Amino acid sequence: MKRHGILNSQISKVLADLGHTDTIVIADCGLPIPAGVARIDLALELGTPSFVDVVRIVADDMAVEQVTLATEIKAANPVALEAVMKLDVPQDYVSHEAFKELTKQAKVIIRTGEATPYANVILHAGVIF
């Protein structure tokens, strides 16, 4: 058994396999998941686990170079936006429709139980050196 970091074996494997600029998505429970994109479904009930918790834990174990968010998060979900801003990496904003198109390129979408609007982020992998 691991002593530190993410215990979920699927997420641990995805993070270990990422290369520079690869992307993963952390999503609320309503974001459509495109055909062909791997899904790790953590949702247990509405709100559990939260977007904020999953972002914090995954980002602590991942070299994040940049994030992409839907522009709509700025007005609709300041709590989720604040959680992402704490990562202290450059942010790119696109429309929600463009965001959904970008998810088609992700290595995986991690679905949380979050049930608030636009609580979705694309994490771009950096390097550890």
Curated annotation (Swiss-Prot):
Function: Catalyzes the interconversion of beta-pyran and beta-furan forms of D-ribose.
Residues of the active site: 20
Protein name as annotated: D-ribose pyranase
One term under GO cellular component: cytosol
Organism: Exiguobacterium sibiricum (strain DSM 17290 / CCUG 55495 / CIP 109462 / JCM 13490 / 255-15)
Highest taxon listed in the record's lineage: Bacteria
Keywords: Carbohydrate metabolism, Cytoplasm, Isomerase
Enzyme class: isomerase
Listed GO biological process terms: D-ribose catabolic process
Binding site for substrate: 28, 96, 118-120
Keyword Acetylation among UniProt keywords: no
Main subcellular location of this protein, as a coarse class: cytoplasm
E.C. no: 5.4.99.62
Family stated for the protein in its record: Belongs to the RbsD / FucU family. RbsD subfamily.
